[in-house]
Amino acid sequence: MVLLLTLTLLFGFILALLIEPIIIKISFKKGFFDKPNERKIHHSTHIPRLGGICFLPITAIVCTVMLSAGFRLEKHWIIDIFSPHQMHFLYFAVSAFVLFCFGALDDLWGVRYRTKFIGQVIAGIILCVSGMWISDLHGLFGLHHISPVLGFPITIFAIVFITNAINFIDGIDGLASSICMLALAYFTIVFYLNENYDYAIISVALAGPVLGFMLFNLFGNPDRRTKIFMGDTGSLFLGFALSVLGVAMNRYTGGNAHYNSFVLGFAPVILPCFDVMRVVLVRRRQGRNAFIADKNHIHHKFMSLGLSQHVVLIIVDILTIVFAAMAIVMAQYINVNIVLIVLLLMWTGLNIILPNHFNDKKE
């Protein structure tokens, strides 16, 4: 199984290395750039923005090939995919494709944020219809098993919230993709340890193209036309995928009495969720549109200290790991609601200490 997971990662990674240069070439030919403006870090350079458009196709190809290989080599577990999880995977593919289309339209021609929001809700509804919804909050807000009447709206809200959290935090090179890589590595390990091998393969299949993209995003040179951004296609798809994996983990790891399954499912995305929640509240308090981007995210706060993008990337990734680890460990010993309060207080304190505004001159 470890060999199969490794081959899955390499397959997706190699495909991304082959496809991303083609996307860059087409982007320059057709003029699909991230437009420079005063808000963006790269405010003086035209850089292609379609790096994430290959995530879904590569993931689909890799999953099809490797799950088929697993069926031939490991029939004792893979056969389960074609019974209870069959509809979940099918509906996940359909809902991911819906969101992929909305993201691609935005990257290619631009669409209003309300349109993208509608697409996210549609994707969430499709997933709930498949039977993949949050049926147990494991003590959060004092609730445990819940009915579809409550579970469906909560699931759709979680999907939209996490999807936007990843989309919003995609502000400096490698940040959204590295957070997603950390989350996917985590999901792979936990699903593997819980013998949910099908979801482990899906997690690795998602990680491969993201890892390949990161090489071009982090180390590409704009002057040599080797740099590319993820775009909304990539960030929306990855945010949606992480939310679905979180819902799946919440449903299928309930047999472990030592860990809170709700925390297990959503611990990797705590930091981006806290960040988007704070940013939206600040924008609304200032009377601004919650979906109009600014320079008030956690990475902007660190950059206002004069730190480079790569240093900020490492700091935020470390914070992501710290918040996730603390949530998982604390939830073993204390009430999940107290865990949430403690983490919120830590996050609030961190944002109070850091500067309130991004200073362009320091950048």
Q: How would you describe each model-predicted region?
A:
Residues V2-V276:
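"…together with the soluble PPM/PP2C metallo-phosphatase catalytic core" -> "…together
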Residues N250-E363:
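C-terminal membrane-associated helical module and adjoining short loops/tails
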